Curated annotation (Swiss-Prot):
This is Ribose-5-phosphate isomerase A. Substrate binds at T28, G29, S30, T31, D83, G84, A85, D86, K96, G97, G98, G99, K123. InterPro entries: NagB/RpiA_transferase-like (IPR037171), Ribose-5P_isomerase (IPR050262), Ribose5P_isomerase_typA_subgr (IPR020672), Ribose5P_isomerase_type_A (IPR004788). It catalyses: aldehydo-D-ribose 5-phosphate = D-ribulose 5-phosphate. Keywords: Isomerase. NCBIfam families: PRK00702.1, rpiA. Its EC number is 5.3.1.6. GO terms for biological process: pentose-phosphate shunt, non-oxidative branch. Pathway: Carbohydrate degradation; pentose phosphate pathway; D-ribose 5-phosphate from D-ribulose 5-phosphate (non-oxidative stage): step 1/1. It comes from the Bacteria. The active site is at E105. One of its GO terms (molecular function) is ribose-5-phosphate isomerase activity.
Length: 232
């Protein structure tokens, strides 16, 4: 079973948690896109949902496949969000934002009764941090914000490259008009402390640590999909 087949298995298992009539947050990324394709097949057969996308990319795919969409202002309280992750640990702490949509992903997840994470088994880790942590920053005062991030990291015993994410024509810009610094710390032993410290930096708009947000993780491997439950 290749990586895409595992993503499809995870998406299929997540779809079983979606009930007709739900207000649904729809994530961003390759695994979330497999979920959208499966959801669209059910919608074509008469299944009713109203989706709130977490990125313009997801919105375009939903429109293309016929999944009905609303804005979060139109549906400010959601039943469920299904989204992928770049890393997930056994406590269901996540690193997200590889696709650049972390701010909207976090806003939508926070507006949901439940969040289910779907991933292939390569994303399940013992300790977060091998995947570079995306930190969404305001373009104004970027150098000062970068220095503040370096100081926070040093206080917590973390070090590594802080790379301003690039796209084909310069700095990557999020749907909200911000930039992303990818912090390669290698290992984050205290994700809660780092989250709190990053939140205290004025130039940091949001970061990719999702803590106490996911209720369930569906992890797919060659033997099929298994479920991890949040212990809180």
């Amino acid at each position: 079973m290749d990586a895409r087949e595992m993503k499809i298995k995870a998406a299929e298992a997540a779809l079983a948690h979606v009930e007709s009539g739900m207000r649904l947050g729809i994530g961003t990324g390759s695994t979330a896109e497999e979920f959208v394709r499966l959801l669209a097949e059910k919608v074509a057969g008469g299944f009713r949902v109203e989706g709130v996308p977490t990125s313009e990319r997801t919105a375009r795919l939903c429109v293309e496949l016929g999944v009905p969409l609303k804005s979060l202002d139109e549906l400010p309280a959601l039943d469920l969000t299904i989204d992928g992750a770049d890393e997930v640990d056994q406590a269901l702490r996540l690193i997200k934002g590889g696709g650049g949509a972390l701010l909207r992903e976090k806003i939508v997840a926070a507006a949901s009764e439940r969040m289910i994470v779907i991933a292939d088994e390569s994303k399940l880790v013992e300790t977060l941090g091998a995947f570079a942590l995306p930190i969404e920053v305001n373009p104004f005062g970027l150098v000062s914000t970068r220095i503040a991030i370096e100081k926070v990291a040093a206080r917590l015993g973390l070090s590594g490259e802080l790379d301003l994410r690039q796209s084909g024509d310069g700095e990557f810009t999020t749907d909200g008009g911000h930039h992303i610094i990818d912090a390669s710390f290698g290992r984050i032993p205290d994700a809660e402390a780092l989250s709190s410290e990053l939140n205290s930096i004025p130039g940091v708009v949001e970061h990719g640590l999702f803590i106490n947000m996911a209720a369930l993780a569906i992890i797919a491997g060659p033997a099929g999909a298994r479920t991890l439950q949040a212990n809180r």
